[in-house]
Amino acid sequence: MYISNLRLQNFRNIHAKSFDFKNSINFIVGKNGSGKTSILESIYFLSHSRSFRSSQLNRIINHNADEFIIYTKAYNPDEITISLSRKKNSNNISKLNLEIQKNHTEITRNLPIQLINPESFNIINSGAQQRCKVLDWGAFYLDKTFLKIWQQTKFLVKQRNSALKQNYPYSYILSIDKKLCEFAEILDYKRQAYFTKLKPKIYEILSHFNPNLQLDIDYFRGWNLHKSLAQVLEESFNYDNKYKVTNHGPHKADIVLSVSHKPIQDIFSRGQQKLLICALKLAQGEIHNSENDNKCIYLIDDITSELDSIHTLTLFNYLKQLKSQVFITTTEKNKINEFIDTNSYILEI
C-alpha cells in the first residue's frame, strides 16, 4: 500500500490542499503550527477513524467550517480511493472506492499504519492495555477471524463486570464465564501466534541499534499459565465480587519487558527505551510486510528531536530495507540532509 495523493479540506488549520507523495520516504518540513503533524494525523484518521492527537473530534474541524473531508488515492497494488468526512456533532462517514462503509474494518485492513511519535515512547511506562494493543494490531492483520473473537471477548468481560456491579446471582456469572473461557482461549492462541513471530524480530532489530542491550520479552496472557481461566475465575470470584470487576482474563494480557526480572523502566535509560520502541515498531512492520502483499505505511513525527543522529540514521536505513512508504516530519531541513537520497521526496509547508 502507498498513498499517491492526499486531499484535505477544513482539517485543522488546512483549509483546502492537495499533496502528492512518492512510494518511498517523504519528508514534510515546516515550522511548528504549519500543519506537518496534521498531515500525519489525517492519514492515521483515514486508517483508524480516530485521531492520535485528540478525542475531541469536533476540534479537528477548522473553526470556520462545519465539516472536514479527507480523501486519498492509493495503490494496493491496484488503485483505490478512501475518503472520510465528519460534520460537527455527527458520526464519521467513510467510503472505500466511493462506497459508504457500514464500519471501518475494511478500510483499516487496506491501510495498515504504524505511528512513531513522542507519545509512542510512553508504551513502556503505560499500563498493560497499551502494550496489549501491540499484539492486537498484529493479530488483526495476521488472522482475519481475530477481530470477531476480540469483540466477543470484550463484550463478555463487560457483561461480567456489569453483572458483578448489579449483584447478579453466581449461577448467572457462571453462564458468562463459560462463554468467556471459550473465547478467551481462542484469543490467547491468536495473540500467542503473533507474539511468537514478534519476539525474535524485536531482538534482531534491536541488535542493529545497540548490540549491548539485553532484555527479556515475555507474553502474559492475563491469567495463571498453569491454570485454566475457568479455575482462575472460580478461585477469584469472591475478590472480583468484592471489587465488582473481573481481575483476570484476556483483557489483562501484557507484553512484559524486563532485565533480570526487573522492569526495564528501572534499568533502561530514556534513550534506550526509545530504541526499544523503534525496534518494536519496525518489527511489527517487517512481520506485516512478510505476511501481506499490502505493505505497512509509517508515520513518524519529529523523530530527529527524539533520537540522536546515529540512531536516526539506523532507523532510516532499516525503513529503506522494509520498502514501505514513510512520512517523516521535521522543523529543520538541515536535520535531515544526511538522510535524503535520490528516492526521497521533500514537501515544504
UniProtKB/Swiss-Prot annotation:
Keyword DNA-binding: yes
Record-level GO BP terms: DNA replication; DNA synthesis involved in DNA repair; double-strand break repair; SOS response
GO cellular component: cytoplasm
UniProt keyword annotations, A-Z: ATP-binding, Cytoplasm, DNA damage, DNA repair, DNA replication, DNA-binding, Nucleotide-binding, SOS response
InterPro entries tied to this protein: DNA-binding_RecF, DNA-binding_RecF_CS, P-loop_NTPase, RecF/RecN/SMC_N, RecF_2
Binding site for ATP: G30, K31, N32, G33, S34, G35, K36, T37
Subcellular locations according to the entry: Cytoplasm
Record-level Gene Ontology MF annotations: ATP binding; single-stranded DNA binding
Signal peptide: none
Keyword set includes DNA damage: yes
Role, per record: The RecF protein is involved in DNA metabolism; it is required for DNA replication and normal SOS inducibility. RecF binds preferentially to single-stranded, linear DNA. It also seems to bind ATP.
PANTHER family linked: DNA REPLICATION AND REPAIR PROTEIN RECF (PTHR32182:SF0)
Family stated for the protein in its record: Belongs to the RecF family.
Protein name: DNA replication and repair protein RecF
Organism the protein comes from: Francisella tularensis subsp. mediasiatica (strain FSC147)
